[in-house]
Amino acid sequence: KVRFTDSDSYMDLVIKTTDHTEPLGIDKKMPARFLLPLIDQKAASGFVNASLALDQARAVKDIQEQELMRKASHLNDMAMAEITHFFKEGVTETDLAEQLKKIYRDLGADGLSFEPLFAFGSNAASGHHWPDDTRLKPGDCILVDIGCTWEGYCSDMTRTFFYKNVTQHQQEVYHTVLKANEEAEKAVTPGIPLSSLDQIARGIITDKGYGSAFTHRLGHFIGLEDHEFGDVSSASADRAVPGNIFSIEPGVYLENDMGVRVEDLVLVTDHGHEILNHFSKELTVID
C-alpha cells in the first residue's frame, strides 16, 4: 500500500512507485485533469481500464468502512425519527426536505447521500418523485427516502407512513411490501445469488397481484457513493460475499393512487447478514 495526503504531488508519487514498462490501470471516472498529465509524462507504457478491478474491490467493505456505514445509518435512523414530528396537515414536501437538511446538520452528519425524497399520496406512485409544493392531507401515504453521509460514507433508508387514517387497501399494499422486504433480508447469506433475493421479493409481490407495480430492481450497492457497482436484480450474475453492503427496497406504485417502499441497508457477514437500519418498519399512522 502507498499512502499519501492531498498535499502530496500525485504525479511524483505515480512516477516513483510504478514500473514504466508496464501499462497503468486507471478508473473509468478518472478526471481528465489527472489523466492528461500522466499521458504527457509517459508515466506508463500505456493505459488499461482497471475499473472492474476497482469496482470489485470497493464492493467489499473492510471493518473500518463497515463501522462508518453503521454510524451513517444510525444518524439516518435518528433523522427519520425526528422528521416524523413535522408531519402536520398542510406541510409541503419541500418544507420537509428543507427541515430534514437542518436535522442532519444538527446531528452532525457530513451532508446528504442524495437529495431527500418526500412524496404524499398519489405523488408516491412515481417511486422517485421530486418534492414539490403538494400539501399533506388526511388519508395520504407519506413515502420518505433519505440518506446522509458520515466521513464520506453513505446511508440510505425508505419508510412509508400514513397520515391520520389508513384504508384496508393501503394496509394490504403496505404489508405486501413489508413481507417482501423482510423475506428477502432473511435470505441474505454468503454465496446466495443476488438474483435470488430479487426473485424472493418479486414473487411475494406478484402473488398478491401487484407484480406489474414493482417497477425497479430490488437493490443497489452503496458505500462512498449512494449507487455503486453491483446490483440486486434478476439480471445480476453475482453472489453475495462478506463485506458487501446493499439495499433491499421492494416497492409497489399504483398510478393516481399511492406508493409504498420499505428499504434497509444490509451487510453480508461471514455467516449471514446484519441490517444496518433499526428504525421501525411496523405500519405507522401519524396523528
What are the functions of these language-model segments?
Residues 1-287:
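Active-site neighborhoods and metal-handling regions in enzymes and metal-associated proteins
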